[in-house]
Design a protein with these regions (language model features):
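ANL superfamily adenylate-forming
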Residues: 78, 165-225, 334-377
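Conserved AMP-binding/adenylation subdomain of ANL enzymes
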Residues: 252-275, 279-372, 385, 407
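Gly/Ser/Thr-rich phosphate-binding loop
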Residues: 201-206, 318-321, 330-433, 446, ...
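Structural core segment of the AMP-binding/adenylate-forming
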Residues: 2-26, 103, 126, 130-211, ...
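Conserved ATP-binding/catalytic segment of the ANL
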Residues: 455-461, 465-520
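Conserved pre-ATP/AMP-binding loop-to-beta segment of ANL
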Residues: 66-69, 183, 202-204, 211-233, ...
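Conserved AMP-binding/adenylate-forming core of the ANL superfamily
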Residues: 46-50, 67, 71-126, 143-148, ...
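Conserved AMP-binding A3 loop
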Residues: 83-87, 229-255
Length: 655
């Protein structure tokens, strides 16, 4: 079928067969082709000399937009978006920062915020930078104990909270050093105010602090590039959370490197980005600050992920960050809809093939016959105006990536990064249609791979642990030199714990994890050792191996039952058979799975840390069968390979 309108292909910024430079030497260090000095081991720190801190980048954005719209919000899912201009935002932010100074907060103090995404988040952040304050974000999945630890470790005297519920959560375990709670909404109860006073904590509203700052001015104290702008706490491992210390230079370098690589597709005045991913994480923070720097606008979601489509239809964003969990849901919904209609599936497959052919020729448009017949509904569910999507936080399956590029008819780039690298390490090139890699290094860093002999990955084979050095790499974990030394070596390389490989075209592909910790598709970290240690408390379990994939949202386990306990239970319940027979019995599986989940709940495992399915295996892991080390530790890669059919089968049957 003929296309509606011919469209010119987008310009490829570099040669696709050679996407990164290799720095001279024998370490095979890869760097960006977008910054001419990268091949000499130098990295970008800024794009404009007058915009080297987040205080300055915001003001440059105000100039670029000519005081255009900056922050958008709506009060309900049925109302329209209303907007605050850059100048209005700057004034309110400065007044709020000044109000904090009136309360006794001083330059370089650490101030917390515990809130969902909303305009006040940005007003606080920019107000903090007016007086060189350090932003520390708290969030739900940290939990009360971790939040209390953070407040105590940072000597935090002031926390901005969204509402009465979050205020009380902070008060539940508030350290003695906490002096002030500032609530964004006016819904705080008098009982909460009394409770706070009994703990020596004063309560204020966001508006009160802003009004105070408008009446009593203080000269601004802008930060230097080397000053800390934020401490981003990550709960990715066992024990207390780690505070990733990031400077203004770190964040500006990271966002400028991404803007540089986006080239013709970078944000500009007139663009609108939907803010819905947590601002507590650096992916969203970098995206938003890059938008502001470009003079573009940010519209905030209403806060309920179930209403995301309503927000998208109302805002009609042109730019959107995304995570695999969201895109997987869109893909799975479509596949489910198509399963009952062979004719619709045929039409869809024909449309996808035609769009993919254009995609491979860098033709990206929304006006083909296939857009009108097949993909218009999906495009409109994202607002209809999307031109750029940035995917991060976890890997996206190749078939889902290709589908989204064809269906949304917009540029979709996929990045790889870590909080310790201020988010981006690498990013795919605009127009590269090949999925399942994460592109070349961005211009603020270089990347090398180092041997992981215990997993049989060697740099000489272009495989190994991903190590990063550059202006985006953090200075260390806050007040934690021991854990800092574990990940930053004496030469300044950050060891990510991820295992990657270089593809022939100079792009990076993440293939494994050196540490046992891994991420699920929704971005949550899993520590299998911790979960296994809880499950093995079950009387029915001799050994267990917890497994997950970064493209999946749940975990599964291989379980070796305790033969004596299980046979005793089977005898009492009149279930005959050998251990092998019992392992395949439905009631036995239900018994052990339910007991595991019960132990998990008793020991505080979160829902995403609980297994969704198990496979019972009669033979123990041992040194002799190659599944245990001489120190009787699990040989994870070997167990994964040994039980690959069973693991694949469990994931096939998960919802």
């Amino acid at each position: 079928m003929a296309c509606c309108t011919a469209t010119e292909a987008i310009r490829l910024p570099i040669e696709m067969s050679h996407q990164s430079e290799i720095i001279k030497g024998n370490e095979q260090i890869h760097s960006s082709k977008f910054f001419k000095d990268s091949k000499n081991g130098m990295f970008i720190s800024f794009l404009s000399d007058d915009a080297r801190t987040l205080y300055e980048t915001f003001r440059r954005g105000s100039y670029e937009s000519n005081n255009g719209p900056c922050l958008g919000w709506r009060d309900s899912v049925t109302s329209k978006y209303q907007w605050m201009t850059f100048n209005e935002t700057l004034l309110k932010a400065k007044n709020f920062g000044c109000g904090l100074v009136n309360l006794g907060v001083r330059p370089h103090d650490l101030v917390g915020i515990y809130s969902s995404n909303r305009p006040e988040w940005t007003l606080f952040e920019q107000g903090a930078y007016c007086y060189s304050l350090v932003v520390v974000a708290l969030y739900d999945t940290l939990g009360p104990d971790a939040c209390a630890f953070i407040i105590k470790q940072t000597d935090m005297s002031t926390v901005i909270v969204e509402d009465d519920i979050k205020a009380n959560m902070i008060l539940d375990k508030a350290p003695h050093g906490l002096r002030r709670l500032i609530t964004i909404t006016d819904s705080i109860r008098s009982a909460t105010i009394t409770r706070a006073k009994n703990r020596g904590v004063d309560c204020f509203t966001f508006d009160e602090v802003e009004r105070s700052g408008s009446k009593q001015d203080h000269p601004v104290v802008p930060p230097n590039p080397e000053d800390i702008c934020t401490i981003c706490y990550t709960s990715g491992t066992t024990g207390n959370p780690k505070g990733v210390t990031l400077t203004h230079q770190n964040v500006v370098a990271a966002m400028c490197a991404v803007l540089l690589q986006l080239g013709d597709q970078r944000p500009r005045y007139g663009d609108i980005m939907l803010s819905y991913l947590p601002l507590a994480h650096m992916l969203e923070r970098c995206c938003e600050n890059g938008i502001f720097y470009s003079g573009a606008a940010v519209g905030f979601s209403c806060g309920n992920i179930r209403n995301l489509t309503d927000d998208l239809r109302a805002l009609k964003p042109t730019i959107m960050p995304a995570v695999p969990r969201l895109l997987n849901r869109v893909y799975d919904t479509l596949m489910s809809d198509l399963s009952g209609s062979p004719l619709r599936r045929l039409l869809y497959n024909t449309a996808l093939k035609a769009k993919e052919s254009e995609l491979n020729r860098q033709i990206i448009r929304k006006n083909s016959i296939w857009d009108k017949l097949v993909f218009r509904k999906i495009q409109e569910s994202f607002g209809g105006n999307l031109r750029l999507m940035i995917v991060g936080s976890a890997p996206l399956a190749g078939n889902v990536m290709t589908f989204m590029r064809c269906a949304l008819s917009c540029i979709i780039v996929e990045g790889y990064g870590q909080t310790e690298c201020t988010a981006p390490v690498s990013l795919t090139i605009c127009g590269d249609s090949i999925p399942e890699h994460v592109g070349p290094p961005v211009a603020c860093c270089c990347v090398k791979l180092v041997d992981v002999p215990e997993m049989e990955y060697f740099a000489i084979d272009n495989q190994g642990e991903v190590c990063v050095k550059g202006t985006n790499v953090f200075r260390g974990y806050y007040k934690d030199p021991e854990r800092t030394a574990e990940v930053i070596d004496s030469f300044g390389w950050h060891h990510t714990g991820d295992v990657g490989m270089w593809l022939a075209n100079g792009t990076l592909k993440i293939i494994d994890r050196r540490k046992h910790t891994f991420k699920l598709s929704q971005g949550e970290y899993i520590v299998p050792d911790k979960i296994e240690a809880i499950y093995v408390k079950s009387q029915y379990i001799l050994q267990n191996f917890v497994y997950g994939e970064s493209l999946k949202s749940g975990i599964v386990a291989i379980v070796v039952p305790d033969v004596d306990v299980l046979k005793s239970w089977a005898k009492e319940n009149h279930i005959p058979g050998t251990l092998s027979v019992l392992c395949s019995h439905k009631k036995v599986k239900e018994l052990i799975l339910n007991d595991m989940l019960s132990w998990g709940k008793q020991n505080g495992l979160k829902s995403f840390e609980q297994v969704k399915d198990i496979y019972l295996h009669p033979d123990p892991f041992s040194i002799q069968n190659g599944l245990l080390t001489p120190m009787f530790k699990l040989k994870r890669p070997q167990i994964k390979n040994y039980f690959k059919p069973q693991l694949d089968d469990m994931y096939t049957h998960l919802p």
